[in-house]
């Protein structure tokens, strides 16, 4: 009888403890394993969208006009409900248009594409320096709220990725305050057991990107460790699984990684290790690079951690950084992207992170890109004539099927499906 009473009390205590946390017990997406998720910036604006941020992320040094822009890929906006006339012209002399991430219809279009092409979901990016007040916080909250609705509508997984870039010393308190704000105001992870927030290891997953980079950041491992501890252990807002975004050479303290050995102790507190590979190799150099993934995975297994590598379709940021060549890492009809996808799977990766869904700034976007970009003083990367504008959405969906063994593994890139 005493044993039975003790067991009942223990169950009640556990139930009370869980009830104090502000998360639903589960989700329609119970694990990152078997999924291909993309990063989602959602940071583009237009002067008339109501956000008060001008041509945010389209402009360069305060100007948006031919010869002055931050983007290298021009998005195809033919399927968007709302678009905005830009100062750029197409080859026939007509006006070129753009979309705003602030519009719910733009976010809805993106999630509809994810469903149509089989992209499993996204991590909505949240730069802590951009969400402290005013227009920045409002924009990011609106985009996240719209993404939550569209993720549910189209049954796509969704999570949040805090990007610590630009955070100052002691900025962990800002992350903690912001997480509480989102949990209380949006009920991010408390939308019922059929919600589409991504869970992992039985807990809602949150990502914290920018830990261990050796690029003169004002914050350090102490702030990162406090954020991880809070997200995992706080009695009310914690109880989360944590993905940490780290440098490429995190494991052996290479050129992009700070040399403090405590880094590995901090990373062991997380649940998933996610190294950033964008710009580290091109197609020719990937074969020599990708064995690193299998060594990373072995380390993670030894330390009871999961691992997700980055894959990206190409890279170009000439308009943002004119000294860099345009089309710096060519897509090569999808061969570069597919080489990384097959390399990661062969190395033992059981989940993938795509950089990025919508980042036209650095030419890594997988969304539909214009085959007829503006002409003039600014130059834009365009896909090859025989490659359709939706090819990278298609490849991303196919990668998910291959990762889950729903289709046979194939080294050769699947050919485009022309409509």
Please report, for each region that a protein language model flagged, where it lies by residue:
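Bacterial Sec-dependent N-terminal signal peptides
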Residues: 1-22
């Amino acid at each position: 009888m005493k044993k039975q009473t003790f067991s009942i009390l223990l169950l009640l205590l556990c139930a009370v403890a869980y009830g104090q946390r502000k998360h639903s017990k589960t989700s329609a997406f119970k694990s990152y394993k078997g999924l291909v998720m993309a990063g989602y910036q959602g940071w583009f604006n237009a002067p008339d969208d109501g956000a008060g941020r001008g041509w945010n992320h389209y402009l360069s040094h305060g100007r948006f006009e031919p010869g002055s822009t931050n983007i290298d890929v021009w998005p195809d906006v033919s399927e968007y409900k709302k678009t905005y006339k830009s100062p750029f012209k197409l080859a026939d002399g007509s006006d070129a248009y753009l979309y705003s991430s602030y519009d719910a219809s733009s976010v809805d279009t993106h999630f509809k594409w994810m469903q149509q092409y089989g992209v499993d979901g996204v991590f909505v990016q949240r730069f802590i320096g951009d969400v402290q007040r005013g227009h920045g916080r409002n924009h990011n909250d609106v985009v996240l709220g719209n993404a939550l609705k569209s993720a549910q509508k189209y049954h796509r997984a969704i999570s949040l990725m805090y990007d610590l870039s630009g955070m100052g010393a002691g900025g962990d308190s800002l992350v903690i305050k912001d997480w509480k704000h989102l949990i209380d105001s949006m009920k991010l992870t408390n939308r019922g057991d059929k919600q589409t927030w991504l869970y992992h290891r039985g807990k809602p997953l949150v990502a914290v990107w920018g830990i261990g980079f050796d690029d003169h950041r004002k914050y350090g491992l102490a702030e990162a460790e406090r954020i991880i501890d809070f997200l995992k252990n706080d009695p009310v807002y914690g109880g989360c699984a944590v993905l940490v975004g780290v440098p490429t050479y995190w494991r052996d303290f290479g050129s992009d990684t700070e040399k403090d050995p405590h880094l590995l102790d901090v990373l062991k507190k997380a649940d998933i290790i996610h190294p950033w590979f964008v710009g580290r190799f091109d197609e020719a150099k990937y074969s020599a690079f990708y064995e690193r993934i299998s060594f990373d995975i072995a380390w993670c297994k030894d330390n009871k951690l999961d691992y997700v590598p980055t894959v990206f379709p190409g890279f170009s940021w000439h308009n943002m950084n004119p000294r860099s060549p345009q089309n710096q890492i060519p897509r090569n009809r999808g061969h570069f992207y597919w080489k990384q996808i097959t390399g990661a799977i062969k190395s033992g990766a059981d989940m993938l992170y795509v950089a990025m869904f919508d980042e036209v700034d650095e030419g890594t976007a997988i969304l539909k890109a214009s085959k007829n970009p503006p002409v003039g003083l600014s130059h834009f990367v365009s896909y090859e004539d025989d490659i359709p504008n939706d090819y990278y959405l298609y490849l991303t969906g196919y990668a998910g099927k291959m990762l889950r063994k729903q289709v046979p593994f194939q080294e050769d890139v699947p050919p485009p499906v022309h409509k």
